[in-house]
A protein has these predicted regions:
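Vicinal oxygen chelate
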Residues: 87-141, 170, 178, 221-270
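Fold-core signature of tandem repeat domains
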Residues: 5, 49, 76, 119, ...
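Short amphipathic alpha-helices within nucleic acid-binding modules
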Residues: 80-85, 213-220
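Residue-level structural signal for beta-strand termini and adjacent loop
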Residues: 36, 61, 120-122, 173, ...
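Exposed loop/turn and edge beta-strand positions of beta-sandwich/beta-sheet ligand-binding modules
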Residues: 4, 43, 52, 68, ...
Length: 270
């Protein structure tokens, strides 16, 4: 495939609590060394995690930055071809240089809705550490990233036309579109203010494929017992909690809905 989905980033106030959750439950491993802490200092104990394909960055949330899902990342065979397609079909889309400390990508861009993502190509100068490796297979891995959009068909066309992602047969419908790199999927689901007032456009959730859903649920329970601070959180609480959960469960790739210790929405399937 021309494009591979390779990166997801979250802003968090507690890197280590979140890292424990993703390492313990999903077997993710550290692939980079060193990230900024809450005081702006370099902490060599922090680093991006990986499931063997997708790098997960648990970034320190600083003042003025919202917690939760922030961006994702694509690796392409030819960045110049992407630039040419953007210039031809989406001239209003901006491409910027990444900051030098970013280990995954040399560029940052966005889709027509403004959802930002990193853009990488093998051989870029600042792609380093674990992102240079071939990776590995493991039984629990990130299989999709979900976006909410008021114009999902337009967004799906963008990811197909520019990045050559392909529709997933049998999944699209009811205003939702699922496009894939052959392994990982971008789910583009409708946004509106009818479902519930707090439903926001933009990055919505991401999900894991696991070897056995019941085994994963048992591991969730064990984590809650052994390390309560890193336990998953219930979604169906508060005024709109049940609506949020039902809305997440409507994702075609969801068999079990949950939230991580920070409240980032996740789903599991097997």
């Amino acid at each position: 495939m021309f494009t591979k989905i390779r990166h997801v980033a979250i802003h968090t106030d507690d890197h280590f609590r979140m890292a424990h959750f993703y390492k313990t439950l999903f077997g993710m491993k550290k692939i980079t060394a060193g990230m900024t802490d809450q005081n702006g200092n370099y902490d060599k104990e922090r680093g991006h995690l990986s499931d063997g394909v997708i790098g997960l960055a648990l970034l320190q949330r600083q003042p003025g930055i919202s917690a939760g899902l922030d961006h994702f990342g694509l690796e392409v065979e030819d960045v110049q071809k992407v630039r040419d397609r953007l210039k031809q079909y989406y001239p209003d889309v901006f491409v910027a240089e990444s900051q030098s400390h970013v280990p995954f990508a040399g560029l940052r861009t966005h889709d027509p809705d403004g959802n930002q993502f990193d853009l990488s190509q093998k051989g870029m100068a600042n792609v380093r550490e674990g992102y240079l490796q071939e990776g590995w297979d493991q039984p629990r891995w990130i299989n999709h990233v979900a976006i909410r959009s008021a114009r999902p068909a337009h967004l799906a066309e963008y990811y197909q036309k520019v990045f050559e992602l392909r529709p997933v047969e049998g999944l699209s419908g009811n205003g939702s579109y699922y496009v894939t790199d052959g392994k990982v999927t971008i789910a583009i689901r409708p946004w509106d203010m009818i479902s519930y007032r707090g439903l926001m456009a933009g990055l919505d959730h991401f999900g894991f494929k696991v070897e056995n859903l019941e085994a994963a649920k048992k591991d969730l329970d064990n984590l809650a017992t052994t390390t309560p601070a890193s336990a998953a959180r219930r979604i169906a609480i508060g005024r709109d909690g049940e609506k949020r959960q039902k809305n997440l469960e409507a994702c075609k790739l969801c068999r079990h809905a949950l939230a991580d210790p920070d409240g980032v929405l996740l789903d599991l399937t097997d």
